[in-house]
Amino acid sequence: TKKWHSMCDVRSHWDLMLRSCKQTIFERLEDLQMNVEWSQLFTERKIRENLNENMFRQQKILSIHEIVGTKNAIERNLELNNLDIEYLIKNALKRINDFWKTDFVQALINRFHKQWMVFERKEYGSANGIDLYCSPDIAVKIQNHWHLVRIDMQGKKDSCFEELEAMAMVSWIMGKNMFPRLPDRYVIRIMAWRNGFWNQQRINSSEQKLTQSNYLIESDVGQMQIVLSKLGKDKSMSLIPLARKSSTCRKCALRESCPGGSNLISGNIQQTILELAEYTQE
């Protein structure tokens, strides 16, 4: 549910900076579409506004955690008491300014590509009966192909599934009326911030990759349905599948109410006992 999701959505200050940074890039791109360019001063003002807004929204969520007694643990896990606004602003501006200098954005500024648009992932698309929130950040028509761009604010190490996950953007956009229905008419471009620079990865779409991507999506949905079935009607977390590594739990907002939050090994043992108890009662 939305309420459950908002309770989980507690982030470190660094993650809030990244979220605000991407939000600012979107707003600047939308203005660019209307031939409005930002000054450096205005860009800094917008990133401050967005960061303050996201931090204020998080404080409201933390006030709920304070009522249920989990706020102190969350603040300790995410180091929320250590705040340096100017350091965050400096890093955000570095990312935005360097993004604006990339060949890709410069081509948009100089009107080399006439047809392009910005999307937000709040809009869902449908693929094989599954609602997907995986739109590209930007779609640009270059000659006979649509280039689907994903902006990764803090690029992680390459995953063996990264290409197939990116192909979900093709599934999403093929469900829209104004776009071609042939997978080979798309090119995926991932612009990821890695080691202090914007790196670009290009992936050519194909029917085979799209089929594999859809299979991966269906598999992920199946796993999520298993998680929901474990919650039961009372939405109890007592039998919810736990993480494999304790490092995964470190920044989880629900750590204090999770059966494996304080000790993953102990949590797994307790769940095994509960599952055996349920099995013997059937």
Model-derived segments and spans:
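Metal-dependent nuclease catalytic cores that hydrolyze phosphodiester bonds in DNA/RNA
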Residues: 1-133
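Glycine- and acidic
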Residues: 3-7, 150-155, 236-238
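A residue-level signal for conserved active-site and pocket-lining positions in enzyme catalytic cores
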Residues: 21, 138, 252
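Hydrophobic transmembrane signal anchors and adjacent membrane-proximal interface regions, especially
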Residues: 34-36, 51, 61-67, 76, ...
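Mg2+/Mn2+-dependent nuclease catalytic core
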Residues: 113-210
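Metal-dependent nuclease catalytic regions and adjoining charged, substrate-binding loops involved
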Residues: 168, 172-281
